Amino acid sequence: MNAAQYLLDRMRTCKGLTEIGDKKAPGCFSSVGSATHSFHGDDAVGFGPSYMVVADGVSGTMKASGVLARMLVGETLTSLSKLRKRSREEPPCAEDFGRSMQAATKSARKLAKRKGRLDSTISAVFFDETSRQMFVYTIGDCKCVVFRGGALVFESDSIVYDFNVPAVVSSNQAINYATEVQVQTFEYETGDVCLLFSDGVHDNLFVDDIASCVGSAEISSSARSKSGAAEEMARRTVQRAKDTFTCNTQYIPFAVSAAGFCLEALSELEANKTVDAEEFERFRRKCETIPSLDVKRATFSKEQRVRQLAFYSASNLLAFAHKKQGKRDDISVCAAILA
């Protein structure tokens, strides 16, 4: 079965599972939708009545990892549909959600085992209507965020090894992030806007950029149909990120993050007594004059650095820290307005 056949088969399976017993259940969303832009073709996105998932295949491997990303999304939709059925009898807890996600990632890895090395990040969110709790599971640097009244009130933690080096689900056992994922929880309210997106969004857009997309879509949709408001939010966010590829004159969040890692690298080099003194001094002077360090706009920067892995050289980091043009990448956004 090739990737296209697999995805079609899984979509049919997920539809059947979702329809069983769900016809009278309104779900947690008053509006839900998604939008994408394909550059490498390695992202995948999906959603059901009370859950959303985004996976971002790593394009730096020998093979395109979009296959694994699509498998992860398909298996997650199936697993969370089953969790939703069970939750009608007993409200789920973080551990229940975590086990469902572990089962989904394990199944996807098994399906991808004979396809060579494939890597992907993933983030999924599940909403429980009874407790009003949302559960977030993340491996890598996809993000789950919540806006309330135009303000950012929740941001999930990225799991990373180094600058622009996320932890991944991998078909290669040595690469796969095997540490137990800590599920994050948040109590949501009616009218909250939840967005799930790949790093093609937060590498290029600041918090106020996305807040603007959310706000303008709400105003626009109020004059038309509120049922399409979430999809409009997703579409506007994708377009705003795409616009940075060609018409951006300010430093992007990717540059701001790189500047921060430059300062970390400076501290590490200072502690390393084997570094040439003249080279260190040159790097120190360059770090002191990085203009993106002066950017005050809020970025989506919450992360857990779970391993010290110096992947990029100091010169690479300096180059990234001066980046103004958008970082071209796949862009995937799933948005929901909570009921």
Describe every region a protein language model picked out:
Residues 1-339:
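PP2C/PPM-type serine/threonine phosphatase catalytic domain
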